[in-house]
């Protein structure tokens, strides 16, 4: 799920693209964000559930979808059985500084500086090398990923708009 993480001290929100708070569905991720992300930060990214399937680590869309459930007991059970991760790809604010009008290259550099990663919160890989991107595109299909994303390095962040190109596998 696409999600924006809002952290201000102990307060953590996981906002969906539509503005719905997803935090109650991913309690293990809320705790990880408190441990692994800076005190005051807003990061755009995705919530994923990686699982070992047929000897390979893949992203499990079905396990992720099951997490949106009204029963707290089921959410807790699934949080233990199929723990989620947050994969950040864009920094919006840090320690009160707004980066949304900065070019993507600058936001990315700052994200790498402030989000050191951990067990549950990681940063997407990027490349500006065409051969590497083509290799990833081929390899990622077997990992359950739709494809790759291309962004302009000089683009500013546009809320509620897709300022990227999705290159998807043919289905």
Residue ranges and their predicted role:
Residues 1-171:
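Catalytic cores of nucleic-acid ligases and guanylyltransferases
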């Amino acid at each position: 799920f696409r999600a924006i993480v809002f952290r201000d001290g102990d307060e953590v929100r996981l906002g969906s693209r539509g503005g719905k708070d997803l935090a109650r569905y991913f309690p293990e991720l809320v705790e990880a964000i408190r441990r692994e992300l800076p005190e005051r930060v807003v990061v755009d990214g995705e919530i994923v559930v990686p699982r070992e399937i047929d000897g390979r680590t893949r992203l499990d869309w079905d396990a992720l979808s099951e997490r949106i459930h009204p029963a707290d007991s089921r959410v807790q059970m699934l949080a233990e059985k199929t723990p989620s991760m947050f994969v950040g790809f864009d920094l919006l604010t840090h320690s009160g500084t707004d980066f949304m009008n900065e070019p993507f290259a600058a936001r990315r550099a700052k994200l790498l500086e402030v989000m050191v990663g951990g067990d549950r919160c990681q940063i997407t890989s990027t490349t500006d090398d065409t051969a590497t991107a083509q290799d990833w595109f081929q390899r990622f299909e077997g990992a359950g990923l739709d494809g790759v994303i291309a962004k302009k390095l000089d683009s500013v962040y546009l809320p509620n708009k897709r300022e990227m190109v999705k290159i998807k596998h043919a289905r």
